[in-house]
């Protein structure tokens, strides 16, 4: 202390005075216990203050002291105390080690950082080369944030643009990770990046990712921002089902666990900048506690928004000079960076056990928190020191034993000194001066990668420990003056430095600190290298490289990459090691190719060939598909021998050498020579005896070789003498017996050498037999293939026949053979053969064998002497044997392997198979090839035999070397962002679709092009009004014209010519608009705003920029003079109702405000005076254009057709309009059936024209009916029917169906052969009558698997007294869905028709009928999802006898109805929709003021609307129930309420403001106790009685019928069936004024995926019928979807299916209009659906889309399959958004991200393409293009006659109940439109 400062109190006063004087505090504000940061002391203030204190106290005071002692009291106490001993932290007490301290091995790493760093090796090179990746932000990165308001633009301009950025962050291999493009677009690119890098890290570790499936593998991923998620959610209209998972931080870890199916912990860690090092710490803990057995620790960081840059800029944290200068005096902040790193961790003992490469060992780690330090973001030196001590205690290591620390080192003026002081205090002090602690920071190379910073430093340190070198810390020139490096015994590594020699393993630490105060430190140590055991590392002579990928293109890319690597960085890696890693440390993939090579040169050449898809020695390209099961070994006869065969196999294939050695004794005994010596010496076999014995010995050894690699025969076939080897392999003979047979045969034949010959002819058998007819000594000896035969006979005659064949230009050649068997010359040898082999005792074969000795292939030969005597004489029926094997009744075989030294039969085999089974897939292989490398050839053929998975290869000892990881095939995936005004995609200008204007320079000397871009949104249209056509908003033609006219004006033009309107612009969803002017052409196009760059643009209008302003003005005046004067006989008419005229033509609304002042019409002219609004901006042309275009279309009021603009010859602009009134003069120049042509002039009264259109052509749209209507309308045309909600209401009218009834006398008895399975109640009687009708019935489910017809007779009684209607429905539903599942899995060529029988549901009087009623709804959905197996549903009368119904059912089965039929008194009725017409029977609904009304589901969106509707009708008391309770009323004002709760509360308050008392009750309406409690409570309180009910409760769960489960069905049926039954019992008929059941049209329309929901709603329909018959005003309202509300709010599938049928959803206003209308009629079930335009109006039926585009029946089978594959590939690729050429026909759709919505869309397109109805589960049952094409080929191909009737019936129907109803309404009799 100095004299002026004598102690702690003086120092405290001095500090207070200093702050008051220099910081600007008042004495009252200075709290000695408040942190200095809170008192306003900044980092730079601390530097100045430390200098003042150093001078005052005469000792060094560091700015760091202010962070260690952050208050005035703490700092004063510290500075007044004696200085601590410099070595006080030199040692850390070593704790006892235990299992929780077990070392952790780093076994794999992967990384992606800027600067082209894509792997750890690239990072190491980058660091050693002292490179930096820092640059300015890529231009496109912040584009979405530019062009905003001035204050935003100014802030962005002031934000630093320095950073370390990854390129192409929008690139991702979505296909590889089985993610659809749509989902990938919404995924945070951090998720995508981590997926790829994690896969690379696992491959680097040598762990095939597929092997981790369902393992206890943990994922710990550090990440701290999801800027992408924020960007994606900025535009609410773009939020979809993928958005939440795409933007959630947790999914960064979870998605990796999901993709790899990992079952260990999956945790996203956010501790800001220390996230990834904390992730490593948590991973180590999880391994030590055995929560997981393998851990993947990661960190990822991307910088997408300038917001965080701006925030750090504001606190001075970012370097203005763009460099991280850690520990340097010029440090001025950090630079933000991007990247990702992943490490794979195991317990060290596990890694050693598994032979893994141990890159480094984690000895210990620690994590702690700053707590309340000198500010939330301020570092705490004490906490940093504490985490260091804890880490080294955990590691069991003295701090002085660490050699290097990878510091956090951000490069800030005070952050660096604080960290250095902590490191020096704990780790540096006590070291020798010549052995300082070395420190550095990777941030000086890569910037601060924040959430990935810890793992970046960790990977760098592991690499340094591995290499024994430490890369330099960049930008370190002058030490930071606030860091006493010498005192702290520390040194910054400023050059490439060899690791210090310390006598112990290399050791290092890694630090990382989060800006919120979470600190982490990890201690690592050099790993011990694992070497193979001595003698086990010998390289094989030949290596097989398996190159795998998910597609052929990926295999090609991987092969090319490997070839490049092996010639470059991997040149020193042994070929065997490369093969080892590829074959045993990479995941199996669907496609793979192989390369067999003896040396590196051969391997590289093979890889290049594989990459190019070319053939080369040793190369097997990926198979296009599997040939199917079943392997046949084919043993050829003589002719395959060659000198040198087998020699290399003896040397390099142990299994072959062992087989030869085992065979050698018996071989020598029978042959008299050594097989081993002949093969080993490469000797030539001479003479028939040597040749035949040598070949069978070779064949038996080759068989063992194949079997040693796991390829074993399921069947064997022998060709001629090859049948001996086949018999041995089959187990009929021993090898010794086989050799004996061969020796005997060859010895007997030897004397005949040279006495006969054989010839191979390119002729089929009949032709050959005709050829040799004149040569009795010549025989057809071998049936080789359909095009090849072999003849045998005297040599001279054979030569003459060869000459004859060659004269016909056909192939013919002598066979090189000593003795010709299979001809009469063998007759003399047969007795001796029988005699010498008489004692042969063959066994029963253990492997199947087809003998080629007999013409009858079903002969089961005994391989005795007689057989072998016959074998040498009879012809060889090889062709027949192969054909039988390839198409046998017991199952076909698909892989044929010729066991020989050279292939003789492979071509004959494949010719035979393809001839017998065209289009089937087979493989025919040899074994060896003459004069080639035996081992390479065999291994190549071995690889060809493996088409499903790679062949087994030897697994050498570990460890394996790393090789390059999987090459990615990136495509762009990014959201369509909502740009600010003024930027690309800005909102269009008022009245036009023009947006931002860009001038595009051209290469040539031609003028520049011009581009205007805008974003059109439904809620921000550029015109004030609306313009709806059939309820769909369409951009008016006037706006389109105004757009291109305005663009022309900007370019100096005032006229357009050759205007052509091509497509309307629908404004019901956002679209991107582009206007392009190129030279004199101008066009307007649009595309979906939510699409991708590959989406198709639709062109809407084109035109030519024509005349100069002066030209157009003169032409305009001339045109006005010619057309603007009305004729003398013109007269002024009454002004018509413009809105009515437009409505008659289907148009609702005007886009601009203008009115008609006068209307003067004559024969061909019309002059209309129009008034414009006074507020119209001067020069606005839009309203004038709009008036002109609309009025021109109405130039003939008597013509009620709709006219749409088609073209304009010329349109010119003149002077601007200055007054509010103008006149539009229309001169009709042409009028025909196709349309009208009009000249138009617009001018202010008495002024020159302002607008002229010459030859404005309109095209007429005629709907085929008169759409004009009288008052009231006598009939309804399609336009009004689609717009007037009262026309939406229909009942179901049951009309007689012309189906023959076999019960009528004289009915023809028809026999319909085919098995029938009958399931359910009272089936015996039905069986008896069906059997009499010619069917083959089977009771219960015995015959379901083979039945052509399946009849399900529904139960009528519950299973027990306690079974409720819900229980009953769930039970029966489960039975039927299981039945559908079974039938759907049957082959397409074995179709079945499913029928369901119910009783009494039509009337629903009996309780049993009500119980069964749900089946009607389920039936419609089965019909929609599985039209191929649906027959129909028949409802019998409640007392009908099933036995009597049998004959009628027999007739129905013959032609499935696809519908619901009702049979009463012998008459069959079918449903049709009938509109509700006539005089109402009831008055409008009025509620009683003294009653209450119950709405179940009343707190939902629909329920609250219905509550409002009842209030409009006088209801004063409402009881609203819902499953979720509202909060207490005292909490209704809380800001914490979510949006949905707030909406409900606001709606209730609005009702209460109207004087309505609302009682909101939480109750489960399906629970009888809940409803009883509600009613009991009301009774106790004396509440008003409930006089009306709306049952609106319900939930849905979209599931295909084949996927429905009992639990899911119960969940849906509970509120509907259970709830309605409870209410029915509580409020019996007569107790209420009305009982409305809000059901769904899904119950009758058959919407796919709505099985449970449709079934539940059909029950409501039946209950309404039942109560109505009891006199209660009960109505079931079968709605289509309410637009944007209720259960269909997000049901895209429902909307798409409605659109497919020609219908649509309805608005709430339309719904209530329809409700009020139908409530006046006596209707129990009202179907509320907008009807489509009548079928046949355009000459086609409602299902014209099902007309086949091709006549499949006239096409060949192969052509059908090819056409189907091409068409389906195109359809599926378009929906999945993948390039068609990249869609592998064998790739499962699920791997491409197929979901149910996509499947439905594909199904619709496929139906149009194929021309038949298809199942909803089609894509899931046939999950590849190839399998789907094969399935459909069976559906469309001709069938046998016995199936024709059924197949046509199954495929010709419309398939959906909705289609059927829409069809029938057109044929409904007049009485159907009766008053109901």
From Swiss-Prot:
One of its GO terms (molecular function) is oxidoreductase activity. InterPro entries: Ac_transferase_dom_sf, ACP-like_sf, Acyl_transferase_dom, Acyl_Trfase/lysoPLipase, Ketoacyl_synth_AS, Ketoacyl_synth_C, Ketoacyl_synth_N, Malonyl_transacylase_ACP-bd. SMART domains: PKS_AT, PKS_DH, PKS_KR, PKS_KS, PKS_PP, PKS_PP_betabranch. It is an enzyme of class 2 (transferase). The active site is at 273 (for beta-ketoacyl synthase activity), 408 (for beta-ketoacyl synthase activity), 448 (for beta-ketoacyl synthase activity), 720 (for malonyltransferase activity), 1027 (proton acceptor), 1186 (proton donor). Residues 1491-1728 are annotated as: Beta-ketoacyl reductase. The modification O-(pantetheine 4'-phosphoryl)serine is found at residues 43, 1796. Residues 997-1267 form the PKS/mFAS DH domain. NADP(+) binds at residues 1491-1551. Residues 9-83, 1759-1836 form the Carrier domain. It holds the Pfam family ketoacyl-synt. GO terms for cellular component: polyketide synthase complex. Residues 101-526 form the Ketosynthase family 3 (KS3) domain. The keyword Repeat applies. Keywords: Fatty acid metabolism, Lipid metabolism, Multifunctional enzyme, NADP, Oxidoreductase, Phosphopantetheine, Phosphoprotein, Repeat, Transferase. Binds 2 phosphopantetheines covalently. Its cofactor is NADP(+); pantetheine 4'-phosphate. This is Phenolphthiocerol/phthiocerol polyketide synthase subunit A. It comes from Mycobacterium tuberculosis (strain CDC 1551 / Oshkosh). The gene is ppsA.
């Amino acid at each position: 202390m100095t004299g002026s400062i004598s102690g702690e109190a003086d120092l405290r006063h001095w500090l207070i005075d200093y702050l008051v004087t220099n910081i600007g505090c008042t004495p009252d504000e200075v709290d000695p216990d408040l942190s200095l940061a809170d008192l306003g002391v900044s980092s730079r203030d601390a530097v100045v203050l430390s200098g003042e204190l150093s001078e005052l106290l005469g000792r060094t005071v560091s700015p760091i002291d202010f962070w260690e002692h952050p208050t005035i009291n703490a700092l004063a106490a510290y500075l007044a105390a004696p200085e601590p001993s410099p070595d006080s932290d030199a040692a850390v007490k070593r704790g006892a080690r235990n299992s929780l301290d077990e070392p952790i091995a780093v076994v794999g790493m992967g990384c992606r950082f800027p600067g082209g760093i894509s792997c750890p090796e690239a990072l190491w090179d980058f660091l050693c080369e002292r490179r930096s990746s820092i640059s300015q932000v890529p231009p496109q990165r912040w584009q979405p944030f530019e062009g905003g308001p001035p204050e935003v633009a100014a802030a962005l301009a002031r934000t630093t643009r320095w950073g370390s950025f990854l390129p192409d962050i929008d690139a991702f291999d979505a296909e590889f990770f089985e993610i659809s493009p749509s989902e990938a677009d919404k995924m945070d690119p951090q998720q995508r990046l981590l997926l790829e890098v994690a896969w690379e890290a696992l491959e680097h570790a040598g762990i095939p990712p597929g092997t981790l499936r369902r393992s206890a593998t943990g994922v710990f991923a550090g990440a701290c921002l999801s800027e992408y998620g924020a960007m994606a959610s900025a535009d609410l209209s773009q939020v979809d089902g993928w958005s939440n998972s795409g933007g959630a931080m947790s999914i960064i870890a979870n998605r990796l666990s999901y993709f790899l199916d990992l079952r260990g912990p999956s945790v996203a860690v956010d501790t800001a900048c220390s996230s990834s090092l904390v992730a490593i710490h948590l991973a180590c803990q999880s391994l030590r506690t055995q929560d997981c057995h393998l851990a993947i620790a990661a960190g990822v960081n991307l910088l997408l928004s300038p917001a965080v840059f701006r925030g750090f800029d504001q606190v001075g944290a970012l370097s203005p000079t763009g460099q991280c200068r850690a520990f340097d005096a010029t440090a001025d902040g950090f630079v933000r960076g991007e990247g990702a790193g992943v490490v794979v961790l195991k317990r060290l003992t596990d890694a050693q056990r598994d032979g893994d490469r141990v890159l480094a060992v984690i000895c210990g780690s620690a994590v702690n928190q700053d707590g309340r330090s000198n500010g939330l973001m301020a570092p705490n030196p004490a906490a940093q020191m504490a985490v260091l001590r804890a880490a080294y205690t955990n590691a069991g290591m003295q701090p002085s034993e660490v050699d290097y620390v990878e510091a956090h080192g951000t490069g800030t003026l005070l952050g660096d000194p604080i960290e250095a002081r902590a490191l020096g205090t704990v780790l540096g002090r006590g070291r020798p001066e010549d052995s300082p602690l070395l420190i550095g920071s990777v941030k000086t190379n890569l910037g601060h990668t924040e959430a990935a910073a810890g793992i970046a430093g960790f990977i760098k340190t592991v690499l340094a420990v591995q290499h024994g070198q430490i890369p330099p810390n960049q930008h370190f020139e002058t030490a930071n003056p606030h860091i006493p490096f010498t005192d702290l015994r520390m040194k910054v590594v400023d050059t490439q430095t060899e690791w210090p020699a310390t006598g112990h393993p290399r050791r290092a630490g890694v630090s990382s600190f989060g800006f919120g105060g979470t600190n982490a430190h990890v201690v690592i140590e050099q790993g011990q290298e694992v070497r193979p055991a001595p003698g086990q590392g010998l390289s094989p002579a030949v290596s097989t490289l398996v190159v795998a990928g998910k597609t052929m293109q990926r295999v090609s890319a991987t092969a090319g990459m490997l070839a490049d690597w092996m010639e470059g960085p991997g040149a020193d890696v042994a070929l065997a090691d490369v093969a080892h890693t590829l074959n045993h440390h990479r995941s199996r993939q669907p496609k793979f190719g192989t390369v067999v090579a003896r040396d590196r040169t051969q391997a590289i050449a093979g890889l290049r060939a594989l990459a190019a898809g070319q053939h080369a020695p040793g190369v097997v390209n990926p198979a296009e598909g599997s040939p199917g099961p079943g392997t046949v070994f084919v043993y050829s006869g003589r002719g395959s021998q060659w000198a040198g065969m087998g020699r290399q196999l003896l040397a390099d294939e142990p299994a072959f050498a062992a087989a030869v050695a085992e065979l050698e004794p018996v071989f020598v005994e029978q042959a008299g020579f050594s097989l081993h010596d002949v093969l080993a010496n490469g000797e030539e076999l001479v003479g028939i005896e040597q040749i035949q014995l040598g070949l069978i010995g070779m064949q038996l050894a080759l068989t063992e070789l194949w079997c040693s690699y796991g390829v074993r025969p399921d069947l064997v076939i022998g060709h001629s003498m090859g049948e001996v080897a086949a018999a041995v392999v089959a187990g009929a003979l021993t090898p010794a017996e086989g050799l004996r047979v061969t020796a005997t045969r060859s010895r007997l034949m030897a004397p005949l050498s040279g006495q006969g010959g054989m010839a191979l002819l390119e002729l089929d058998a009949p032709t050959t037999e005709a050829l040799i007819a004149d040569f009795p000594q010549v025989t057809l000896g071998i049936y080789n293939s359909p095009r090849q035969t072999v003849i045998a006979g005297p040599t001279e005659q054979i030569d003459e026949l060869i000459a004859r064949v060659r004269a016909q230009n056909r192939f013919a050649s002598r066979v090189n053979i000593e003795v010709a068997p299979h001809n009469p010359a063998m007759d003399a040898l047969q007795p001796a053969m029988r005699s010498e082999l008489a004692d042969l005792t063959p066994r029963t074969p253990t492997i199947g064998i087809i003998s080629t000795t007999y013409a009858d292939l079903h002969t089961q030969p005994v391989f005795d002497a007689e057989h072998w005597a016959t074998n040498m004489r009879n012809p060889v029926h090889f062709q027949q044997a192969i054909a039988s094997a390839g198409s046998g009744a017991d199952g076909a075989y698909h892989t044929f392997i010729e066991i020989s030294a050279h292939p003789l039969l492979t071509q004959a085999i494949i010719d035979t198979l393809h001839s017998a089974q065209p289009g089937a897939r087979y493989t025919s292989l040899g074994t060896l090839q003459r004069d080639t490398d035996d081992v390479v050839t065999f291994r190549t053929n071995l690889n060809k035999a493996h088409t499903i998975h790679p062949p087994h290869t030897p697994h050498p000892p570990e460890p394996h070397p790393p090789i390059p990881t999987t090459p990615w095939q990136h495509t762009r995936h990014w959201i369509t962002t909502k740009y600010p005004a003024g930027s690309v995609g800005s909102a269009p200008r008022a009245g036009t679709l023009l947006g931002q204007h860009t001038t595009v320079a051209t290469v040539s000397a031609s003028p520049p092009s011009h581009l205007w871009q805008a974003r059109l949104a439904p809620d921000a249209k550029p015109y004030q009004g609306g313009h709806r056509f059939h309820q769909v908003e369409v951009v008016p033609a006037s706006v389109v014209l105004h757009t291109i006219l305005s663009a022309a004006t900007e370019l100096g033009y005032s006229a357009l010519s050759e205007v052509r309107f091509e497509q309307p612009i629908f404004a019901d969803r956002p679209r991107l608009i582009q206007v392009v002017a190129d030279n004199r052409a101008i066009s307007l196009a649009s595309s979906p705003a939510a699409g991708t760059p590959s989406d198709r643009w639709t062109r809407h209008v084109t035109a030519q920029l024509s005349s100069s302003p002066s030209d157009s003005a003169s032409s305009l005046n001339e045109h006005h003079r010619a057309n603007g004067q009305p004729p003398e006989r013109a007269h002024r008419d009454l002004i018509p109702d413009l809105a009515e005229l437009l409505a008659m033509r289907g148009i609702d609304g005007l886009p601009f405000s203008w009115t008609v002042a006068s209307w003067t019409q004559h024969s061909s002219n019309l002059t209309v005076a129009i008034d414009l609004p006074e507020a119209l901006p001067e020069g606005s042309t839009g309203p004038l254009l709009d008036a002109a275009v609309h009025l021109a279309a109405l130039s003939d009021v008597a013509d009620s057709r709709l006219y749409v603009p088609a073209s304009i010859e010329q349109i010119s602009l003149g002077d601007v309009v200055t007054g509010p009134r103008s006149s539009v003069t229309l001169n009709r120049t042409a009028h025909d059936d196709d349309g009208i042509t009009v000249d138009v002039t617009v001018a202010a009264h008495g002024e020159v024209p302002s607008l002229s259109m010459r030859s404005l052509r309109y095209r007429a749209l005629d709907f085929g009916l008169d759409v004009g209507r009288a008052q009231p309308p006598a009939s309804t045309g399609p336009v009004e029917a689609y717009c007037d909600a009262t026309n939406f209401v229909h009942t179901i009218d049951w009309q007689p169906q012309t189906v023959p009834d076999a019960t009528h006398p004289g009915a023809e008895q028809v026999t319909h052969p085919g098995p029938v399975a009958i399931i359910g109640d009272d089936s015996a009687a039905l069986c008896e009558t069906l059997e009499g009708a010619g069917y083959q019935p089977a009771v219960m489910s015995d015959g379901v698997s083979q039945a052509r017809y399946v009849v399900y007779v529904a139960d009528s009684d519950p299973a027990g007294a306690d079974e409720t209607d819900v229980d009953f429905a769930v039970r029966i539903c489960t039975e039927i869905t299981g039945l559908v599942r079974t039938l759907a899995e049957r082959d397409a060529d074995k179709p079945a028709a499913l029928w369901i029988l119910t009783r009494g549901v039509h009337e629903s009087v009996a309780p049993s009928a009500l119980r069964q009623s749900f089946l009607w709804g389920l039936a419609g959905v089965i019909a929609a999802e599985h039209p191929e197996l649906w027959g129909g549903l028949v409802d019998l009368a409640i007392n009908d006898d099933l036995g009597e119904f049998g004959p009628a059912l027999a007739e129905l089965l013959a032609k499935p109805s696809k519908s619901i039929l009702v049979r009463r008194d012998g008459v069959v009725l079918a449903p049709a929709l009938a509109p509700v017409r006539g005089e109402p029977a009831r008055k409008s609904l009025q509620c009683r003021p003294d009653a209450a009304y119950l709405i179940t589901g009343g707190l939902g969106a629909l329920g609250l609307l219905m509550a409002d509707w009842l209030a409009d009708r006088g209801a004063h008391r409402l009881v609203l129930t819902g499953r979720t309770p509202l909060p207490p009323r005292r909490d209704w004002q809380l800001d914490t309420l979510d949006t949905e709760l707030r909406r409900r509360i606001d709606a209730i308050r609005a009702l209460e403001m109207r004087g309505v008392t609302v009682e909101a009750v939480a109750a489960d309406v399906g629970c009888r106790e809940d409803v009883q409690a509600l009613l009991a409570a009301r009774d106790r309180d004396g509440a008003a009685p409930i006089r009306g009910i709306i049952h609106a409760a319900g939930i849905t769960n979209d599931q295909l019928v084949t996927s429905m489960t009992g639990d899911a069905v119960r969940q849906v049926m509970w509120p509907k069936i259970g709830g309605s039954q409870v209410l029915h019992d509580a409020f019996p008929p007569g107790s209420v004024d009305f009982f409305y059941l809000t059901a769904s049209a899904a119950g009758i329309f058959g919407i796919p995926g709505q099985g449970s929901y449709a079934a539940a709603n059909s029950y409501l329909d039946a209950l309404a019928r039942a109560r109505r018959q009891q006199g209660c005003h009960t109505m079931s309202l079968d709605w289509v979807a309410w637009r944007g509300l209720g259960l269909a709010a997000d049901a895209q599938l429902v909307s798409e299916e409605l659109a497919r049928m020609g219908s649509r959803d309805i608005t709430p206003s339309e719904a209530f209009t329809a409700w009020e209308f139908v409530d006046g009629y006596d209707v129990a079930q009202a179907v509320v659906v907008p009807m489509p335009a009548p079928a046949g109006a355009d000459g086609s039926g409602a299902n014209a889309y099902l007309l086949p585009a091709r006549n499949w029946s006239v096409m060949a089978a192969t052509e059908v399959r090819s056409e189907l594959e091409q068409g389906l590939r195109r359809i599926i690729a378009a929906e999945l958004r993948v390039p068609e050429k990249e869609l592998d026909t064998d790739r499962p759709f699920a791997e491409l991200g197929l979901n149910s919505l996509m499947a439905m869309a594909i199904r619709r397109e496929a139906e149009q393409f194929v021309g038949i109805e298809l199942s909803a589960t089609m894509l899931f049952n046939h999950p590849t293009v190839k399998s789907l094409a094969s399935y459909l080929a069976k559906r469309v191909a001709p069938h046998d006659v016995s199936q024709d009737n059924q197949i046509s019936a199954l495929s010709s129907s419309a398939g959906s109940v909705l289609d059927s109803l829409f069809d029938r309404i057109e044929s409904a009799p007049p009485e159907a439109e009766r008053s109901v």
